[in-house]
């Protein structure tokens, strides 16, 4: 990879009008990549559980693979086994003292296994830095994987978050992402619901402020029969923040009886915010059920009057509503330590915004 190479990332699986500038996102990324710092348990060898996990596609697209090509970059591997009970894997990820860092984790859940993966992206020591991290997940038959990702990078520190996953028969994948940092975020998830009755449930919460950019791409491919996915995205944009959300649900031939739904709620609290949303539902199968919806707007006069009647000004009311939206999500983490970290980070970020 060349130094400061231009990459097209977060591509839509089916192109829309070019003038919308939503088919993909162009970023410049430094090719001089060094291993990121990850505090984790001792790695275990991933089993060959019916597929080569390394070949999975992530939601950020093929061009981003160049970032991870250096053989010296960090690769962690974990396996969850049914006899081990409910397993929790905690990863603290940072660029530390590097300007450009990257790493990968492979996680396989064997048949009937249950595992929770908690990834926290924390600020590096450099004021300007890039962190790219790739997570690949294989959920074996009747297994459950919960992936929880918390972004807390400071302003000037970019995160490229690449997630790829495959779900076997009756497997379940739950993804919860909280973007409560100050830096730009490029987030891509791709999931292959290959097994019959496999499921994906995704919840994303974010706050964008100042000049921050949030660019998200979710691609869910339904292959098996009676598969199910639901996507829920909730966030707030303030000041001159920019956000793009691409949500694609693709019902492949043979996926009869499958269902997919995506919903987004965006609170706009700045005159200069820029919000773009493109829900995409593709069908090659007749007997499927796909839906999408979005609620985008400001606080209405009735809500503001309610707060004003209680002596609460508009700015404070906006902060209360912003925090409430995200509190509902992070309480789904079901890990007391991580919930506390997110609550503290949210308070810190919102306090910074008011300065």
Model-predicted regions and their roles:
Residues 300-303, 320-327:
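Small/polar glycine-rich anion-binding or flexible loop at a beta-alpha turn
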Residues 5, 58-305, 309-310, 333, ...:
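Conserved beta-strand/loop scaffold segments within soluble protein domains that form the structured core
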Residues 1-74, 81:
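Long, low-complexity, mixed-charge
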Residues 326-335:
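Short arginine-rich
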């Amino acid at each position: 990879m060349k130094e400061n190479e231009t990459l097209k990332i977060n591509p839509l699986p089916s192109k829309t009008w070019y003038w919308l500038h939503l088919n993909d996102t162009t970023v410049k990324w430094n090719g001089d990549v060094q291993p990121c710092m990850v505090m984790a348990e001792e790695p275990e060898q991933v089993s060959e559980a019916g597929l080569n996990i390394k070949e999975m596609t992530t939601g950020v697209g093929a061009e981003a693979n160049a970032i991870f090509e250096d053989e010296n970059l960090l690769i962690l591997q974990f396996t969850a086994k049914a006899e081990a009970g409910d397993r929790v894997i905690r990863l603290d990820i940072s660029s530390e003292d590097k300007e450009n860092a990257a790493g990968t984790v492979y996680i396989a859940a064997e048949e009937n296994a249950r595992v929770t993966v908690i990834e926290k992206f924390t600020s590096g020591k450099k004021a300007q830095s890039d962190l790219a991290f790739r997570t690949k997940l294989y959920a074996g038959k009747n297994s459950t994987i919960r992936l929880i990702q918390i972004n807390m990078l400071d302003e000037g520190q970019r995160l490229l978050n690449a997630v790829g996953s495959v779900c076997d028969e009756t497997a379940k994948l739950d993804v919860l992402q909280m973007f409560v940092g100050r830096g730009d975020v490029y987030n891509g998830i791709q999931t292959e619901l290959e097994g019959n009755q496999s499921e994906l449930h995704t919840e994303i919460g974010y706050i964008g402020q100042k000049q921050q950019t949030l660019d998200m791409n979710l691609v869910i491919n339904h292959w098996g029969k009676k598969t199910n996915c639901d996507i829920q995205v909730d966030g707030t944009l303030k000041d001159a923040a920019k956000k793009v959300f691409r949500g694609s649900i693709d019902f492949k031939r043979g996926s009869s009886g499958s269902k997919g739904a995506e919903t987004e709620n965006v609170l706009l609290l700045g005159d200069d915010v820029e919000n773009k949303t493109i829900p995409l539902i593709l069908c090659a199968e007749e007997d499927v059920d796909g839906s999408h919806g979005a609620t985008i707007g400001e606080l209405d006069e009735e809500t503001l009057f309610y707060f004003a009647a209680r002596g609460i000004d508009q700015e404070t009311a906006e902060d209360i509503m912003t925090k409430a939206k995200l509190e509902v999500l992070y309480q789904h983490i079901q890990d007391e330590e991580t919930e506390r970290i997110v609550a503290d980070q949210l308070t810190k970020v919102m306090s910074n915004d008011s300065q």
